[in-house]
Each structure stands twice: as structure tokens, then as C-alpha cells.
């Protein structure tokens, strides 16, 4: 079986927020309903996520739409098309970078311009946290 990083990214699905006792068998059972599987890999250290590779890209997309937010292995799971270095980003494909949960598309270095890259950075000054019995968000000033 190939290492999970060598799987076909067009057919690879990221499964997040899995319980620590999630088994390969349970995940196979949930995902095989959408099409034939090539590989299933469940993280053990740290636990909480898995990758599932389908034979066909369309089955992976169907499973992603159907299973995202459903309960599996005792928790409500997050299911997304996986992303990685070998995915063709020129077509605008992307996704989460794994456990970050951002769900944002990533911009490749070649697609960035100096103005785009520098406009994404801000100076944050005067961070203040007020004491309270209830957690309060930090207040800050942005200087553009």
C-alpha cells in the first residue's frame, strides 16, 4: 500500500474531528457506501483524523458532500477534499491544510504578487486583556 502522501489527491478525502478510538473498519464502512476505496489511513499519534482514497474522484466528492458534519465513530466529523503539494493549484483547487480547519484556499508563491503578499500583514499594537471572571476577547488596534 502506498504511503498516504503518495495517494491520488483528486480522490483523497480528509476526515477530521474523529474520536481517538476511531477504527479503520468503521471509517471504511461509512465511506465505502459512496464508491470503491483504494486506501484508508487512520492517524494514531496524534489521533483524531484520517485519509480515505477512493477509486474515482466523483465518489470522493459525493462522500465529502454527504458525510461532512455527520456523526461517525462517536463524533461529528469534518470531511473535506484533501489538499497537498501535488494538487494542481493552477485551476484554483485547494482546501484545508489538514487539522487547521481553516477551509480557505491557499495561494501558491508563484501566484502571489508583492502587493498581495505585503497587504496581508498588519502591525498589531497595544494588546490589552481586561481581568474578568468571564473570558473576554483581547482588544487591539490595527495599523495599516
From Swiss-Prot:
Gene Ontology molecular-function annotations: mRNA binding
Positions of the RRM domain: 11-84
Tissue specificity statement from the Swiss-Prot or TrEMBL entry: Ubiquitous.
Pfam families with a match to the protein in the record: RRM_1
Domain of life: Eukaryota
Species of provenance: Drosophila melanogaster
Subunit structure: Interacts with x16 (via Arg/Ser-rich region).
GO biological process, one term: regulation of gene expression
Keywords assigned by UniProt, alphabetized: mRNA processing, mRNA splicing, Nucleus, Phosphoprotein, RNA-binding
Family note: Belongs to the splicing factor SR family.
Compartment annotation: Nucleus
GO CC, alphabetical: euchromatin; nuclear speck; nucleus
Function: Contributes to the activation of female-specific DSX splicing in vivo by recognizing the RBP1 target sequences within the purine-rich polypyrimidine tract of the female-specific 3' splice site.
Protein name: RNA-binding protein 1
PANTHER family: SERINE/ARGININE RICH SPLICING FACTOR
Ranges for region Disordered: 78-115
Encoding gene per record: Rbp1
Record note on modification: Extensively phosphorylated on serine residues in the RS domain.
PROSITE patterns to which the protein is assigned, alphabetical: RRM (PS50102)
